[in-house]
């Protein structure tokens, strides 16, 4: 504490020097900290919990009582619930840390604005994605293009993320699906990109929820 278990993940080189800095809390910094905390609580208590209790849990508990449209809406809604819950939690952590004199990195950057699976992971859980990129993806050669090994590394990278977020049973399947979506966008031609972008918008929303479901 104040760096909490679920993130943001802070590297020692960034956090330890802050332990030796004199404590200083300006009015502007205090106001920003309160904003982060209230924003996180709003996401968690108002958006995530309300969606879960009033709609999503009801559909998932008794799907036979609902239409296909309602079930699909619940699936997309669950993606939003996961985002609001997780990002709300880390927003509160950032705000509390700021009140205590520490600066933690931003952990989400509007991930559901992404137009592809690759962009989704550049926006989702930034501290985890960056850590895995620097210590797993790049050292294994994932930034090389066009080789079979690079495809396998993309798959391994996404499976590792699934394992980190505690989804071992779905990790392999979702690793395949995410890697497939990533490679589809990465290697498609210009003529195909418009179609693939719209497919990936839907794929990103659905898999984003399933990954944490």
Q: What are these regions, as identified by a protein language model?
A:
Residues 1-213:
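Membrane-embedded transmembrane alpha-helical bundles that form the catalytic cores
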């Amino acid at each position: 504490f104040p760096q909490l278990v679920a993130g943001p993940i802070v590297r020692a080189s960034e956090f330890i020097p802050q332990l030796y800095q004199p404590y200083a809390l300006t009015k502007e910094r205090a106001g920003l900290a309160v904003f982060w905390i209230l924003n996180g609580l709003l996401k968690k208590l108002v958006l995530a919990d309300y969606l879960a209790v009033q709609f999503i849990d009801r559909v998932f508990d008794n799907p036979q009582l609902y239409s296909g449209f309602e079930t699909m809406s619940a699936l997309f809604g669950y993606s939003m619930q996961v985002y609001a819950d997780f990002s709300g939690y880390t927003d509160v952590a950032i705000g509390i840390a700021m009140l205590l004199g520490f600066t933690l990195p931003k952990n989400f950057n509007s991930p559901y604005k992404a137009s592809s699976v690759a962009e989704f992971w550049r926006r989702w859980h930034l501290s985890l994605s960056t850590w895995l990129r620097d210590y797993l993806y790049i050292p294994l050669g994932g930034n090389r293009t066009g080789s079979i090994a690079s495809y396998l590394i993309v798959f391994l990278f996404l499976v590792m993320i699934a394992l980190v977020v505690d989804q071992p049973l779905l990790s392999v399947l979702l690793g395949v699906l995410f890697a497939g979506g990533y490679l589809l966008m990465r290697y498609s031609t210009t003529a195909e990109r418009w179609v693939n972008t719209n497919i990936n918008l839907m794929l990103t929303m659905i898999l984003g929820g399933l990954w944490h479901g």
